[in-house]
């Protein structure tokens, strides 16, 4: 992939621009606030270009008081960089998270202020993978309880008879970098590998040595289940009473990814009733872990979020993020910006209005497609077809496509690489003959669940409009919560959907129907004020005339 367009920082989105920044540095040393414990090697890198103040344990109010004097903040997981802090940081140019997750940073607020947010997506990969494997082995061989027993001067060999992992089935939920490394080591240990990841191709799974299956089969067949997925609305409480009931009574669950993916109360019930064989958890819905019955069970291992807590990982993430902060303060690109692409000012001026459009359409077709995606086609239409450097738009579309599955792990720098690793073929086409708008984008996602497409354009005031979905003409702005229905164009169907939504207390903000012929197929696009409650989408698909329904979050 040609990354020439990344050689200049997106100064069009930043304030001040590069020349002003360099003049600023000639007279005044930049200042960096380090608000959490960071390895000294990272601080030393920052000191090459800035005055560094290490102030840990500050409250939000305390940070708000001092942040106006800083050009950058470097943090780990303890500090919460809220919208209020960002608004107070009038000089902030970059916020760096020494780790993978950026859920403790208000990224949209930072983006609105033109502040770059960076992370270290690979710095703790090995540490997190090894911790998951260690938890699996500790669970299989009762190591924590056996250790405690011997230290109490006991010798209870029969009580701690374990199980081998050799020839057992490991179910890996999420085959990103961490999940793939876990799978590779487990394969070397002689384990059979099942995996679920809707964004991984079978070819990539074959390279890792996994058999791709659906979640139901994975849950029912696996002896050990390890989770390596971000927390999203779709993955929250993925492990719940219903999914636990599908597992073997000897199944053991390992979660070293994100808290909130497991319904902890349901897990307590499953452990208490011997519905599953055990669990090893490094992350929790609320941290630090408060009152919890999980502490009561000998077959539950708990650690205090140690996935990235190795000397090597702490050095890796500190160096990675400190170097990016240094580079941005010098007017250079950040290699792992999660919110802003690295564009030169002239390219940014032309394409900036369309980046959000491309990302929005990518998010839309990704959610409509649902299953694993094999191909993404991005067509630049009208005036956009004349741009020679259109690569940023393609990357923005990929970022949107993968955003629901990967969240903070996908950014403008790594989006194309993430797509390639998942076996997604990206095709760019151009069609200057389309003149419905001065410039528009058409995206088509093809995968295991079929093919879905969407077209969008910008109004003269810069507002985004979705102009067709699955080749049905519409004209609607994107909304946080949206519902799309494919149905037969017939009297009464709109009223039925409206009544059904109303019965669940879901308010409709706007609605539009697109059709090609009278009484033929049609699509309904509804913007909602509220997310759909559990079970409502299924009820909608039961309405006579409804052929399919999709809920989308934009």
Curated annotation (Swiss-Prot):
Annotated source species: Synechocystis sp. (strain ATCC 27184 / PCC 6803 / Kazusa)
Q: Which UniProt keywords apply?
A: Amino-acid biosynthesis, NAD, Oxidoreductase, Serine biosynthesis
Summary of the function given for this chain in its UniProt record: Catalyzes the reversible oxidation of 3-phospho-D-glycerate to 3-phosphonooxypyruvate, the first step of the phosphorylated L-serine biosynthesis pathway. Also catalyzes the reversible oxidation of 2-hydroxyglutarate to 2-oxoglutarate.
Which reactions fall under this protein's catalytic activity?
(2R)-3-phosphoglycerate + NAD(+) = 3-phosphooxypyruvate + NADH + H(+); (R)-2-hydroxyglutarate + NAD(+) = 2-oxoglutarate + NADH + H(+)
Binding site residues for NAD(+): 177-178, 197, 256-258, 282, 305-308
The UniProt entry's GO biological process terms, in alphabetical order, are: L-serine biosynthetic process
What terms describe the molecular function in GO for this protein? NAD binding; phosphoglycerate dehydrogenase activity
Ranges of residues in domain ACT: 482-554
Family classification: Belongs to the D-isomer specific 2-hydroxyacid dehydrogenase family.
* EC nos: 1.1.1.95, 1.1.1.399
Which residues are named in the active-site annotation? 258, 287, 305 (proton donor)
Name this protein carries in UniProt: D-3-phosphoglycerate dehydrogenase
**Where does the record locate the signal sequence feature?**
none
Question: Pathway involvement?
Answer: Amino-acid biosynthesis; L-serine biosynthesis; L-serine from 3-phospho-D-glycerate: step 1/3
């Amino acid at each position: 992939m040609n990354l020439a367009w990344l050689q200049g920082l997106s100064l069009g989105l930043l304030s001040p621009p590069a020349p002003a920044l360099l003049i600023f540095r000639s007279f005044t040393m930049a200042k960096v606030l380090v608000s959490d414990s960071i390895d000294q090697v990272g601080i030393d890198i920052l000191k090459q270009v800035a005055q560094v103040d290490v102030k840990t344990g500050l409250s939000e109010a305390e940070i708000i008081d001092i942040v106006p004097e800083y050009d950058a903040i470097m943090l780990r997981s303890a500090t919460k960089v809220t919208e209020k802090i960002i608004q107070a940081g009038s000089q902030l140019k970059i916020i760096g998270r020494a780790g993978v997750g950026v859920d403790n940073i208000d990224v949209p607020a930072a983006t609105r202020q033109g502040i770059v947010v960076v992370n270290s997506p690979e710095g703790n990969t090995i540490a997190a993978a090894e911790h998951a494997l260690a938890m699996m082995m500790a669970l299989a061989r009762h190591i924590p309880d056996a250790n405690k027993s011997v230290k109490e001067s006991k010798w209870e060999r029969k009580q701690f008879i374990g199980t081998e992992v050799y020839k057992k089935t490991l179910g890996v939920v999420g085959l990103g970098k961490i999940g793939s490394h876990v799978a590779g080591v487990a394969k070397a240990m002689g384990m059979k590998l099942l995996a679920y990841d809707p964004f991984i191709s079978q070819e990539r799974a074959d390279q890792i040595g996994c058999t791709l299956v659906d979640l139901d089969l994975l849950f029912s067949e696996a002896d050990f289940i390890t989770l390596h997925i971000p927390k999203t609305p779709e993955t929250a409480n993925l492990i719940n009473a219903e999914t636990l009931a599908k597992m073997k009574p000897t199944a053991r669950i390992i979660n070293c990814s994100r808290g909130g993916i497991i319904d902890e109360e349901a897990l307590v019930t499953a452990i208490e009733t011997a519905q599953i064989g055990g669990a090893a958890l490094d992350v929790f819905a609320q941290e630090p872990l408060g009152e919890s019955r999980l502490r009561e069970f000998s077959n539950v291992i708990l650690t205090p979020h140690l996935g990235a807590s190795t000397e090597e990982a702490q050095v890796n993430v500190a160096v990675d993020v400190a170097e990016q902060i240094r580079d941005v303060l010098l007017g250079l690109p950040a290699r792992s910006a999660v919110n802003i692409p690295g564009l030169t000012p002239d390219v940014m001026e032309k394409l900036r209005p369309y980046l959000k459009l491309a990302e929005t359409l990518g998010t839309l077709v990704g959610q409509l497609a649902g299953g694993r995606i094999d191909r993404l086609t991005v067509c630049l239409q009208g005036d956009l077809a004349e741009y020679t450097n259109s690569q940023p738009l393609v990357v923005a579309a990929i970022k949107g496509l993968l955003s629901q599955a990967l969240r903070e792990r996908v950014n403008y720098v790594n989006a194309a690489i993430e797509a390639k690793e998942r076996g997604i073929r990206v095709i760019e086409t151009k069609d200057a003959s389309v003149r419905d708008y001065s410039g528009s984008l058409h995206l088509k996602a093809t995968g295991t669940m079929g093919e879905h497409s969407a077209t969008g354009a910008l109004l003269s005031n810069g507002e985004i409009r979705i102009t067709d979905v699955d080749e049905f003409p519409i004209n609607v702005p994107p909304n946080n919560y949206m519902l799309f229905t494919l149905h037969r164009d017939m009297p009464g169907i709109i009223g039925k959907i409206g009544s059904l939504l109303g019965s669940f207390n879901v308010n409709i903000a706007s609605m539009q129907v697109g059709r090609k012929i009278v009484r033929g197929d049609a699509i309904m696009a509804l913007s909602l004020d509220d997310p759909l409650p559990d079970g409502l989408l299924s009820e909608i698909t039961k309405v006579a005339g409804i052929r399919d329904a999709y809920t989308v979050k934009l």
